[in-house]
């Protein structure tokens, strides 16, 4: 059994008059690093909402490590698009937040939060407020908070466009930083992105969503791309152009923005 399985899943939001997903089947294996791309509104983030029980009215079956999303509540460590740091809490207290509902002492929470902060390269910033940090540093804090969730029995990390709000130079720096972070994890990682190069660089597989509703996912192996220089080989450039053409075709067919 795969770590994540969608079997014949059909879903649409009640306020919409169309389906986003129809009889969709796919799987993700343990320790896969998957980047999810597709046109705006095609259902990328919806996959995460289904896996985290934020949406529960669907047909078909979804399992995470053999359990339904409801049974597996808390299995996924989730990093949203916006960092959602609490401005009145310092960095240490922001990172300890997911641990406060767990049966552990304050000393244990602080110790684990400090370890996560160290792993993301922000030691010495524990007492700073979010407003004192740059955008890239705030995203590192958000990742540290996601790490402490992952350490408590969660085998799945979901990253929803974590760098979309950053400027281009910070984004490139954070992409290179993230690669080193996720490849050392004992977890299945799925990341939504609109950036084709980011998808090719961070993941070992790309899930390409297209159509409305999405009926199948095209899986593309990019495990041969291990560093930024690999993006400029002839085969990688050809793949990038193919993915961009797929985006443009989808845009033309739907008549909306990508």
Question: Can you describe what each PLM-predicted range is?
Answer:
Residues 37-39:
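The feature captures the beta-strand-to-loop junction immediately N-terminal to the Walker
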Residues 52:
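Helix-to-loop junction immediately C-terminal to a conserved catalytic motif
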Residues 59-72:
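Conserved ABC transporter NBD signature motif
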Residues 89-96:
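Short coil-to-helix segment of the ABC ATPase nucleotide-binding domain corresponding to the Q-loop/switch region
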Residues 96, 100, 107-125, 180:
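Conserved ABC ATPase "signature" region
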Residues 122, 126, 147-150:
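ABC ATPase C-loop
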Residues 129-137:
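Conserved ABC ATPase signature
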Residues 143, 147, 157:
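Hydrophobic anchor residue at the start of the ABC signature
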């Amino acid at each position: 059994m795969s770590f994540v399985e969608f079997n014949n899943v059909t879903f649409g939001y009640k306020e919409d008059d169309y389906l986003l997903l129809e009889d969709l089947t796919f799987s993700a294996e343990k320790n896969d690093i998957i980047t999810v791309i597709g046109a705006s509104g095609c259902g990328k983030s919806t996959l995460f909402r289904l896996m985290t029980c934020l949406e529960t009215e669907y047909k078909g079956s979804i399992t995470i490590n053999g359990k339904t999303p409801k049974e597996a509540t808390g299995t996924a460590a989730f990093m949203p698009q916006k960092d959602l740091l609490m401005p009145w809490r310092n960095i240490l207290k922001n990172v300890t937040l997911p641990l406060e509902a767990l049966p552990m002492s304050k000393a244990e929470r602080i110790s684990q939060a400090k370890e996560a902060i160290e792993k993301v390269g922000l030691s010495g910033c524990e007492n700073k407020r979010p407003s004192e940090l740059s955008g890239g540093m705030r995203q590192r804090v958000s990742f540290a908070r996601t790490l402490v969730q992952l350490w408590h029995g969660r085998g799945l990390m979901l990253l929803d466009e974590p760098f979309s709000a950053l400027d281009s130079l910070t984004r490139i720096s954070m992409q290179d930083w993230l690669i080193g972070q996720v490849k050392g994890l004992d977890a299945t990682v799925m990341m939504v992105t609109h950036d084709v190069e980011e998808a090719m660089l961070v993941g070992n597989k790309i899930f390409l969503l297209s159509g409305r509703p999405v009926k199948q996912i095209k899986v593309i192996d990019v495990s041969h791309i291990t560093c930024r220089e690999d993006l400029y080989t002839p085969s990688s450039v050809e793949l990038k152009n193919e993915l961009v053409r797929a985006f443009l075709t989808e845009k033309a067919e739907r008549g909306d923005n990508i």
